[in-house]
Structure formats: C-alpha cells, structure tokens
C-alpha cells in the first residue's frame, strides 16, 4: 500500500517535469547541440498580439516565474481535483477504501 501512496504523490510531479521539459524543448528553450544549453529568448513573429514597435530584438523570455507557477501549482491541482472527483464514485464495500 505504501508503494501506491508514493506513486499517487509522485505522479503529478513526474507529469509536471515531463510536460515542462517537452514544451521547453519544442519552443527551443532547451537545446542539445554539444551539451544542454538554455536559450531563454523566443521571437514570436507569428502572433498578432505582439506589436512590431517596441519589441526586444532578441525576443521575449519563455521560461519565467509564471511558467514555474503554472506547472508547479496548476498541474498538481488538476490531479487533486481529479482525485476528489474520483472519490465520489468509491462506495464502501465495493472497493476496500
């Protein structure tokens, strides 16, 4: 039972790390040329929201404190809400919970 509890606690952390790593690689922030490097600037040319005037020449930062907050707080919160939702379907006697 302890292994199941440990898995339930670590699953949101593993998903957070995996999804953060995936998107930062896809955006080009994590680059593996000769070694792992971090390029924390991205030029978003294809968006209509960003104005042409006043834009930094090397782009905007991708990996910020907000990125950490969304991934570190948002993803485990979804798992927590899912667990609460799943508890509504556990009946005593059917599943030994």
Curated annotation (Swiss-Prot):
GO terms for biological process: photosynthetic electron transport chain. Signal peptide: none annotated. The chain crosses the membrane at residues 4-24, 70-90. NCBIfam families: cyt_b559_beta, PRK02561.1-1. This is PsbF-like protein. It comes from the Bacteria. It comes from Prochlorococcus marinus (strain NATL2A). It is a multi-pass membrane protein. Keywords: Membrane, Transmembrane, Transmembrane helix. InterPro entries: PSII_cyt_b559_bsu, PSII_cyt_b559_N. It is found in: Membrane. GO terms for cellular component: photosystem II reaction center. GO terms for molecular function: heme binding.
């Amino acid at each position: 039972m302890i292994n199941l509890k440990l898995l339930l606690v670590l699953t949101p952390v593993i998903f957070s790390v995996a999804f953060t790593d995936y998107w930062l690689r896809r955006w080009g922030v994590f680059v593996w040329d000769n070694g792992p490097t971090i390029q924390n600037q991205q030029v978003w040319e294809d968006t209509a929201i960003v104005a042409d005037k006043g834009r930094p020449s090397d782009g905007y930062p991708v990996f910020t404190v907000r990125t950490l907050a969304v991934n570190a707080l948002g993803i485990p919160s979804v798992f927590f809400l899912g667990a609460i939702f799943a508890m509504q379907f556990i009946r005593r006697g059917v599943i030994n919970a």
